[in-house]
Amino acid sequence: MLTNRVKKLSGLLFTHEHKDHIAGMDDIRAFNYVNQCKVDVYATKQVEDSLRREFPYVFEDLKYPGVPEINLHRIEDRPFAVGDLDFIPMPVMHYRLPVTAFRVGGFSYVTDANHIPEKTFELMHGSDVLVINALRHEKHVSHFNLEEALQIIDRVNPSKAFLTHISHQLGKCVDVDALLPPHVRCAYDGLEIFVD
């Protein structure tokens, strides 16, 4: 976030409790300091339980000075607002682990998944932009591979799609992009997507 000069954090939405998706919790403290306010954090009960185990000092009544300061909000099975944006939580599966995908306006975001239920496909219908994980070329037990991600992109039919959660096994993005349809590209650090 520092490299991309992010100055304000309106909210932080957790998709699931794996370490590579929650370890940045400590980075909130910089936004607490600069903006002089708590950061709104959104998580399911399952993710909240994990956050409390991994970061107990954030949730203590008597906090040590300088720990991340948050307002924790529970994600339920219904839309919720973060500032002026309305988010729709969408269930997906990461092998046996429930993960929350999100839709905001015409933008849908699906990471760490290998199964999308029909209910979620219905919620994704009409998305203009889709971000979806595509770990590698070969099948994987808990992530979509490139072929599966492209099939989902075809089904959702967004005008633009980005592949995320890519491993080195997929190859260099410049090489992968050359193989993709014109409306599909690899996501990259610093990518900005504007939603309404």
Protein language model features and the residues they cover:
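Active-site metal-binding motif and surrounding structural segment of the metallo-beta-lactamase
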Residues: 1-43, 127-128
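Core dinuclear metal-dependent hydrolase active-site scaffold
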Residues: 2-4, 69-122, 189-196
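Short, glycine/charged-enriched secondary-structure capping and boundary segments
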Residues: 3-6, 26-30, 55-57, 102-103, ...
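Active-site neighborhood of phospho(di)ester-bond hydrolases with catalytic His/Asp-centered motifs
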Residues: 10-20, 43-44, 107-113, 130-135, ...
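Active-site neighborhood of divalent metal-dependent phosphoester bond hydrolases
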Residues: 35-39, 47-72
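Conserved beta-strand segments of alpha/beta enzyme cores
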Residues: 40, 69-71, 86, 160, ...
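Binuclear metal-ion centers of metallo-dependent hydrolases, dominated by the metallo-beta-lactamase
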Residues: 117-196
